């Protein structure tokens, strides 16, 4: 699930809501300890002025875009019920959004990821492809300081499983689907150059992994598996504005408590050679009590460029379960050419199709790129086209 990508997008907008829009090209390095985060933060730095007066309709028609590539490296040590795991993830995210008449923001983000997980020391491996589409929305509740953020997303997972058993290969394919959402309420209190931002948040998600049957000696048949996510968060963030007439400079930090209230899942299976008995393993990951710490900077230069950096640490607090995740986020932003247009739309009734289009005018030529995705069959029904027209 990737709800934090949208939340970080909205946080950037509000920290810099007195500036013009920027488009972001991001890079993320994520070095994980014994606890891997299931909600991976993705920083985005595109923003436009949000003022107290009502914006005009032409402004609300403008769409702004952001893109991001990320690399995640992680390791989970061996436990009494699971082998050691090493993880490598590569992903690309692209999003578009617009500003609403109520001074809010709404948009969509599309993410494609590749996961490579090595299990144990004998060559067992899990390769996965993930597809996610996330809708995000923020609206003021009473004034320009109190906002409610709403996130909703769907995803598809395709996995290739290789198990090394007594020197032989046991293989299987598995697919899954997920739905997730976040509701966050936050307020702002300003004193001189400091802004204090308390917030409360709830994350909900459900993933269904389809059953599968391995092929090979000692193969097992696995039933459908359901995994539920339920997090409660309370946080206090601080933004210090040190801007000058030549550039914008803001440093910010956050301290957050997270309660992971649902961490278990049942893994039900039987051996192909003996279907008379069903075995059940109760899997539990993570800790109930967690503390997240974050520090970062935003720098905006006058010539269309911006720099964005965050260091984040997620630390477990439970006795008997020790783990942490260290994340480093880096981003460089640039204001796009005014002759370039971006658009995102959803259409359909029985089949819901998303369309993303980029149009650019170069001299007398109009160049457009269109990407269409059937949301009912993520990763299976996609179309891309490039068109070039000359204006006489």
Question: Language-model segments: which ranges?
Answer:
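Membrane translocator/pore-forming domains, dominated by Gram-negative outer-membrane beta-barrels
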Residues: 1-12, 16, 59-392
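Short boundary motifs at domain starts and secondary-structure transition points
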Residues: 52-60
């Amino acid at each position: 699930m990737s709800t934090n990508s949208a939340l970080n997008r909205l946080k950037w907008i509000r920290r810099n809501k007195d500036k013009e829009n920027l488009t972001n090209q991001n890079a993320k390095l994520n070095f994980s300890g014994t606890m891997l985060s299931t909600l991976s933060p993705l920083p985005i730095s595109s923003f436009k002025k949000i003022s107290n007066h009502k914006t005009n309709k032409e402004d609300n028609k403008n769409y702004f875009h952001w893109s991001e590539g990320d690399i995640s490296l992680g390791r989970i040590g061996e436990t009494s019920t699971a082998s050691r795991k090493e993880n490598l993830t590569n992903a690309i995210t692209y999003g578009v959004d617009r500003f609403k008449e109520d001074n809010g923001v709404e948009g969509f983000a599309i993410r494609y990821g590749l996961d490579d997980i090595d299990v144990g020391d004998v060559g067992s491996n899990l390769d996965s492809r993930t597809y996610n589409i996330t809708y995000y929305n923020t609206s003021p509740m009473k004034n320009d300081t109190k906002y409610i953020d709403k996130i909703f997303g769907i995803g598809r997972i395709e996995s290739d499983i290789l198990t090394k058993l007594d020197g032989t290969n046991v293989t299987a394919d598995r697919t899954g689907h997920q739905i997730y959402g976040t509701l966050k309420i936050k307020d702002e209190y300003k004193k001189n150059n400091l802004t204090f931002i308390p917030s409360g948040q709830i994350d909900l998600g459900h993933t269904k992994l389809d059953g599968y049957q391995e092929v090979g000696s000692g193969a097992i048949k696995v039933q459908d598996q359901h995994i539920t996510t339920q997090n409660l968060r309370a946080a206090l963030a601080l933004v210090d504005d040190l801007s000058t007439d030549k550039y914008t400079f803001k440093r910010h930090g956050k301290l957050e408590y997270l309660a992971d209230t649902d961490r278990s899942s049942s893994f039900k299976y039987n051996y192909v050679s003996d279907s008379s008995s069903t075995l059940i393993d109760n899997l539990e990951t993570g800790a109930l009590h967690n503390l997240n710490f974050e520090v970062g900077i935003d720098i905006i230069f006058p010539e269309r460029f911006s720099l964005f950096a965050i260091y984040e640490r997620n630390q477990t607090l439970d006795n008997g379960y020790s783990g942490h995740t260290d994340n480093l986020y880096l981003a460089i932003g640039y204001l796009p050419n005014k002759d370039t247009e971006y658009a995102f739309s959803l259409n359909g009734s029985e089949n819901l199709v998303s369309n993303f289009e980029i149009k650019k005018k170069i001299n007398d030529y109009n160049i457009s790129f269109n990407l269409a995705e059937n949301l009912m069959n993520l990763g299976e029904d996609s179309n891309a086209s490039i068109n070039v027209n000359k204006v006489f």
